[in-house]
Swiss-Prot record:
Cellular component, GO, one term: plasma membrane
Main location: membrane
Subcellular location: Cell membrane
PANTHER family: PHOSPHO-N-ACETYLMURAMOYL-PENTAPEPTIDE-TRANSFERASE, PHOSPHO-N-ACETYLMURAMOYL-PENTAPEPTIDE-TRANSFERASE HOMOLOG
Regions that span the bilayer: 3-23, 53-73, 78-98, 118-138, 143-163, 174-194, 200-220, 226-246, 251-271, 314-334
Disulfide bonds: none
One Pfam family hit: MraY_sig1
Protein's organism: Streptococcus equi subsp. equi (strain 4047)
Pathway(s) it belongs to: Cell wall biogenesis; peptidoglycan biosynthesis
Protein name (database record): Phospho-N-acetylmuramoyl-pentapeptide-transferase
Gene: mraY
Length: 335
């Protein structure tokens, strides 16, 4: 536990020191920052804000994790597990980096095409499966102690889980501080589970990433000086999915990650209902004022009759939701 705290503090310090230099470099090079194409008017002032901050906390977290792992976890099983998680984080980080790079430096509005991004994400999931899942012989989903053996279909589940949650966290990263703190809450919940299981290798990775993310939040809270970009959000979502699989607690991510599930579900429901009503009535209708769900809250709260919610209020509501959901999972598992 001391090792995890020490590593987390080092990650916090290094990220906190490096981030201002990254922001300054961004500004000195006059790189075009975040573009805003949204209907939420209060977001227009954010146009040009530096992005790709995930590059910094990912490099810090993965580098420290590799160093600490090589020094303190020399057995093959732990190194294989740590390598599997870190590789999927790096691969998804690279995917996000390419996406951000094309948008910002090459002025390609959509970045990677949906097909390109999905293909790369599948490859990342396969790498994790080959490095961690196959050697462990795992082929079952653990749900409340019951193991559902899927055989080869477990590969499909792993790919669905990793790709799905990487994109879900990406959708969540839409207002200042929301994704970074939401992921910290989720990681802390998995830190408790890892500690209870004696999985100190996973706990180390969690502690380092939590430290790096807390330092990033110093620059990402409203008004944000920098955004994490796809490089950060895609990697963090993949990390959460990989950790839930590594700890054999896959189902918990549906609850611990309730914020990401809600954000993604709102988009899927909105698109489906809009297409259905357009076909049936000749005009598309909406369930939510705007999606993902955090924009729905910004434009009128839960009821729609309230005044527009500030970003801080939306953040506080969704952070609290994630925290309560995480505590419920821990209560189910250990009380």
């Amino acid at each position: 536990m001391f090792l995890t705290i020490l590593a987390g503090l080092i990650a916090f310090a290094v990220t906190a020191l490096a981030m201002p230099h990254f922001i300054r470099l961004y500004q000195l090079k006059k790189i075009g920052g975040q573009q805003m194409h949204e209907d939420v008017k209060q977001h227009l002032a954010k146009a040009g804000t530096p992005t790709m901050g995930g590059t910094v906390f990912l490099l810090v977290a993965t580098s420290l994790s590799f160093v600490f792992a090589l020094v303190y976890f020399r057995d093959g099983q732990s190194l294989g597990l740590i390598s599997g998680i870190l590789l999927i984080v790096l691969i998804y980080g690279i995917i996000g980096f390419l996406d951000d790079f094309l948008k910002i430096f090459k002025q390609v509005n959509e970045g990677l095409t949906a097909k390109q991004k999905f293909t790369f994400q599948i490859v990342g999931g396969l790498v994790f499966y080959v490095i961690h899942v196959m050697p462990s012989g795992i082929d079952a989903i653990n749900v409340f102690g019951y193991h559902w053996h899927l055989g080869f279909l477990y590969l499909c589940f792993v790919l669905f889980w990793v790709v799905g949650f990487s994109n879900a966290v990406n959708l969540t990263d839409g207002i200042d501080g929301l994704a970074s703190v939401s992921v910290v809450i989720s990681l802390l919940a998995y830190g408790v589970i890892a500690y209870a299981q004696g999985q100190f290798d996973v706990l180390l990775l969690i502690g380092i990433m939590v430290g790096a993310l807390l330092a990033f939040f110093l620059f990402n809270h409203k008004p944000a000086k920098i955004f994490m970009g796809d490089v950060g959000s895609l990697a963090l979502g993949a990390m959460l999915a990989a950790i839930s699989i590594a700890l054999r607690q896959e189902w918990t991510l549906l609850v611990i990650g309730i914020v990401y599930v809600l954000e993604t579900s709102s988009v899927m429901l909105q698109v489906t209902y809009f297409k259905y009503t357009k076909k049936k009535y000749g005009e598309g209708r909406r369930i939510f004022r705007m999606t993902p769900f955090h924009h729905h809250l910004e434009l009128g709260g839960l009821s729609g009759k309230a005044a527009k919610w500030s970003e801080w209020k939306v953040d506080a509501f969704l952070w609290a939701l994630g925290l309560v959901a995480s505590l419920i999972v821990l209560a189910i598992l250990y009380l």
